[in-house]
Amino acid sequence: MSSPGAIHIDKGSKVTSKKATYRVENELGEGGFGSVYQISDMENLYALKLTKMWTFMPHERIEFAKRFRQEYDYGSRITSPYIVRSHDFDMLEGNPFMVMDLCTGGNLRDLVGKTFDSQKLDEIAHGILMGLKDLHDEGIIHRDIKPENILFDNQRVPKLADFGISASIKKRHTVANFMGHAKEVFATGTYSPPEQIDPKQAMKVMGPSNDVYAFGVMMYELITGGQLPFGPFKEFMKDMAAYELKKKEEKWDRTALVKSSPDQKWVEIISRCIQYQPEDRYGTIDEILSVLGYQPVREEASPDVYPHSEWVLRVQNGEEIGREYYLTNLKNSKSSGVLTIGWFNKDNPFTNDIGIAEFFTEYISNYHATLEYSSDDHHWYIRDGQWREKNGIPGWYKSTNGVLVQGSRVDESGKKLKPGDIIAIGDTTLKVVIN
């Protein structure tokens, strides 16, 4: 991509996209990756987020621009009262920008240090959890849950912001430059689950449990008036390895939480959220909502499955959002009910029946998973790994980083797929759809 210009937008200036012309009212905030402005068109007020593309190294710009566009796509695609909605996207002198909902009620950081009764605390948590649920239902993991990314509209409804883009960049910097990057990159580390920041586990599949962990840390901070379970940020910066060891050993300050909680159920919730092992945390957002006393949202009835149903896997998150793999057509063309999934190798594009593109990460194995169609119940089953020959020995070999379905790990014995299920393979999520 061409070199972006270093720009600053002044109050009163105009920003034009293909859809509209906006007037800049004032600057709302500035960070290392970009700036946010309050803007208006002829009728409404919005927020405009501009990336400082000129601050990135040339080899980083393509990835960042792609991730930024993904965040816009997520925000424009998902209709939820608990997620900041995206309305417009364009470029300004080589710097991408998006136009979003304007949230005038501040963010959750503004409430840290205040005292809440049980009802008010539950209401705040409910809105955050509903936003996470709506993201997870679409196969999107936020991966950067912290108070600054929980905004409030003028009705004090919490809304999730900054999903997808900053987490991706920060996570990569954190792993690649573990001891020497800017404070802004590392600020997320105190909320991150161990598997996100540990280089030995960084390539493992990330599912809803990633956000569950960060939610637990954030609620601990809110309840205790600004404390963090494993110690303050300065301790993290002073000795990251020691801080991460405390996460691993689950050595956190329960006393502060017990003393501060308006309801002791929060001790139970947070204790489970910040378990070291992902499988020991809550598996779904609905489980936390249930503990809080909220009835699970009634899901739409799953469509009936028939022998003639056409099964599709749709990419929800990854390099090729929106791409669809037609399982029924692939099965018929192969005359086989067994399909393989793995990393797309451009030098050998027919290694798998379904090759998943992965340009900036290395999560997907060459031979990652297997889909098998059952003529008995007309459903597909997914198994981790593939039957193949390795070092001259035939056998079933599992993938390096695993497969998740609805946030639960799948082994080689397989799991039955249902319409609406979310499959996570590496950093890519696929939604099961039938026509």
Regions found by a protein language model. Give the residues of each.
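AlphaC helix of the eukaryotic protein kinase fold
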Residues: 58-77
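Activation-segment/catalytic-loop signature of the eukaryotic protein kinase fold
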Residues: 89
